[in-house]
Amino acid sequence: MITVGIDHGTSGIKVCIKNNDKTITTYFKMSRTELKNKSFLGELNKYENLRDIDLIAMGYSMGDGINEILPIEKVENRGVINIEGVGEKVGGGTKMYDEIKNSNIPTVVIPGLHKNIECIDARFRALYSHMASPEKISIAYCAYKTYGFNNFILSDISSNTVSLLIKDKKLFGGFDACIGAPGLLHGAIDLEMIRDIDSNKITANEAFSTAGVIKVVIDKYKGVENTKEEILKNYKTDEKCKLAIDTLILSVAMEINSLMFLNPDKNIVLAGSIATTKEYNLVDKLKEYIKGNIYILEGESGALGGALIAEDILNGKKDILGIPVNI
């Protein structure tokens, strides 16, 4: 059995190819710019014969146009209501999606976490129209399969920060990138930004795209693909870079703690490029603020989670953390 998981994130895509027959797992990445200028399937074919792939699992953008995991041929409008208000758009992900859809490779599309997902607690559905994009579902599934917890908080800390609560093996609720803790790039819109939006200095989407802790050190902004490396490069020598990361850690702790009273087993799983950057020492710093059991997912957990979802669907699983599978 060969399955492929695709994590379509802010800075590009990460791909996991899981070959159960040979017990081999292969990863590769493509930047958003690369994706726009190259054939995704041409790149995938370098690692695995396309005819041998049993199932691809992927998400697209916010995933708010579908409520269950569906075959790609049954998905309308790429599974989104529209693509406005979702951060900077390059076009590579759209090109990849259409290339896969036209290929006849068996593929399922994973929804995002939004108000029409029925396993979510009614109070979260009343509060928020959207809680997570599809790759966060894949990361949560990777955490579930890796650690086997029935109850846990997943906090994915990268260009944005999204924290999800899983209770009794089902998604219960969470905080999207534009609601709670900021990420490196994206974050909640505050008073100053509301004024800038109302005075037509910036759009709401532009505000969201730079409302993360990058606003502390905006001169280090190098676009969605290169800002992380720029911050890391200057972290030990630039006080503002250090302040940005320290601010991020504090806000993540606040977000996780706000969900802890609903998390009976006190298990927290961290993921994402900021969480796994050794220089930031995130786990030890978060332990100062959080009373719980903190674990970390190394590597490309979104891509691996997608491959695991595809594998379990082929093995007959009817739901993924409470989200129905309809194939």
Swiss-Prot record:
Which InterPro entries does this UniProt record tie to the protein? ATPase_NBD, Methan_mark_12
Q: Where does the source fall among the domains of life? A: Archaea
Originating species: Methanococcus aeolicus (strain ATCC BAA-1280 / DSM 17508 / OCM 812 / Nankai-3)
Which protein is depicted?
A: UPF0285 protein Maeo_0978
Similarity remark:
Belongs to the UPF0285 family.
